[in-house]
Amino acid sequence: MKTEAFDTDVLIIGGGNAALCAALMAREAGSRVLLLESAPRAWRGGNSSHTRNLRCMHDAPQDVLVEAYPEEEYWQDLLKVTGGITNEHLARMVIRASSTCRSWMRKHGVHFQPPLSG
């Protein structure tokens, strides 16, 4: 078995959407990043290729986002799916920050499709 040594600041195991975003953020912050993925090339990216919806706050329709999804509606949806068990301060911070995720993902080559209809 061949052994290699890598000098890295951040080690990420797995190459799904969250892992790839974490790797990009760490690299943008100046860290040396090593991402390990065992999936064959055709399967890399985890479930990202099957993801149909992106949940991010937006106050008006924007290209593929056909309706507004304001902070309060997002918060109420979060309360429903968590049964009300959530930290409001932290949740609202994440909800507000989600408004920039689409442009950040686009900057890194993610392509979005319009919603399905029918």
Model-derived features: positions:
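Beta1/beta-strand and adjacent pyrophosphate-binding region of the FAD-binding site
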Residues: 2-18, 34
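Residue-level marker for well-ordered alpha-helical positions
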Residues: 17-20, 99
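Hydrophobic alpha-helical segments, principally membrane-spanning helices and signal/leader peptides
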Residues: 22, 37-38
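Generic hydrophobic/aromatic pocket-lining and core-packing "Φ" positions
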Residues: 22-23, 102
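Conserved N-terminal/central alpha/beta ligand/cofactor-binding core
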Residues: 32, 38-118
